[in-house]
């Protein structure tokens, strides 16, 4: 993941279990902000991020195992400009009064080819990478927290943005 984001001009926070914090500090102190996430579950870790940042702060969640971000060009996958999609995602959220954007859940050009560049409304965005405008009231409680996060954002804000040609 750090290779994917190393050239982005944003401040990076690494939320990690207390048991791993010392190793992260040793390796990345001064380059990234290292703070405690949760020792319990991914869901608890994501809720810790929401709690850490102020309301309406723009946050990009990324799991630690992301190796690339790819875009379907109609014929093949190519490297996507992640900075563009982060900025466009937050712009579209602002324009539509939404608080969440994400990416297509499967890397399959066959299914992507009939899609629009992005869609609005209720659709699934996989939790490995998604942008949110922080709402401290929205907490997830289940194992499938990415499904739940999409649904509760749809219920509260009327939809989410999903980029249909982009997959990690």
Question: Which residues does each predicted region cover?
Answer:
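Short, high-confidence coil segments that cap the C-terminus of an alpha-helix
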Residues: 56, 95-99, 158
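Short, well-formed alpha-helical segments that are part of the catalytic scaffolds
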Residues: 1-9, 20-26
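Short, intrinsically disordered, charge-balanced linker/junction segments flanking boundaries
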Residues: 3, 166-168
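Active-site-proximal specificity loops/subdomain of glycosyltransferases
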Residues: 15-62, 67-81
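Conserved catalytic core of nucleotide-sugar-dependent glycosyltransferases
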Residues: 69-148
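A short, conserved alpha-helix in the catalytic core of glycosyltransferases
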Residues: 142-166
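Short, hydrophobic beta-strand segments that form beta-sheet elements in well-ordered domains
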Residues: 11-18, 101
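Residues at the starts of beta-strands that form the adenosine-phosphate
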Residues: 11, 58, 159
